[in-house]
């Protein structure tokens, strides 16, 4: 069919918690197998050999938004808004599954930009299904600076609002070039950095 595939390799090492690695991997695979959306990759198959997992999946051509912002700094507002709209579409899709899927680690490093302008959300290793009646997550996961307060544990179960918080932090980073994952780990009104930015976008963030 002349279609390119990507192979994601996950190795079990003595330093890894083997059970946790396998659990996260199986979670990622089971979630992605059930999903079909233009901003998500498709899982094709998985193999286990010699303490190594090989995941065959769609090859996503392009670069991560992290690589782009690391090289070029803040991105044009028009581009960021376009990416944000696409991210809202895929998050809405995830959050309206039964049960809802919470991504939990939205950040520029987990977003690929294809040459045609379409973004693809990658790496579902921290994603989880929302469990009605559960007080908090079994394992607290997320990236400092982008993570919502409840992701640090003890403040309730992550839900759709968690991903929206992550999205706001991601948009902030993209449009200002200021990384919330670095000291002082704060998010300020975007027009303090660039007065030409939209007041509407500032309010949304």
Show which residues each predicted segment covers.
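AlphaC helix of the eukaryotic protein kinase fold
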Residues: 14-34
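Activation-segment/catalytic-loop signature of the eukaryotic protein kinase fold
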Residues: 46
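Conserved short submotifs of the Hanks-type protein kinase catalytic core
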Residues: 50-64
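AlphaC helix of the protein kinase catalytic domain
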Residues: 65-75
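Activation segment signature within eukaryotic-like protein kinase domains
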Residues: 83-84
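Protein kinase catalytic-loop region centered on the HRD/HxD motif
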Residues: 89-101
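C-terminal lobe helix-coil module of Hanks-type protein kinase domains
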Residues: 145-205
